[in-house]
Amino acid sequence: MPSSLRETLLRDEGLHLKPYRDSRGFLTIGVGRCLETKGISMAEAEMLLDNDLREAFRVADHLPWITDLDEPRRNVIYNMAFNLGVQGVLGFTKTLELVKQGRYVEAAAEMLRSEWAKQVGNRSERLALQMESGLWR
């Protein structure tokens, strides 16, 4: 028997960690949070961003040499990990090897030859320039 409103709502609404359509067809997540009518707050968006950044930073667990890069170049890899997931960015084996060797112009060109570059457009061009130059873009 539920002993709080929280427990009752969890029972009645259920817990959904991925978006779903509720009984009226509204996109919903969590415990009955209607994304279409309520959305999320700024604090919730920042919390999600912080969680996603922590996940992106885990790329360093697989690339210990990343800490030797200057901040702008290191953040190119983090940005890509944020977008693609850690495993996705680890699939850029040639690019990452070129970065590790300090061959940034070639690494940037390799980034731009990828399917990812076609998908994200200007983002890839900006990040490739940042990788090449070591300057924030």
Where are these regions (language model features)?
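Mid-chain, well-packed structural core segment of small domains
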Residues: 66-93
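Long, amphipathic alpha-helical surface segments
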Residues: 1-18, 24-26, 33-51, 56-59, ...
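Conserved interaction-surface patches within small, structured recognition/assembly domains
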Residues: 60-65
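Short hydrophobic/aromatic-rich motifs at helix boundaries and adjacent loops
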Residues: 29-31, 66-67
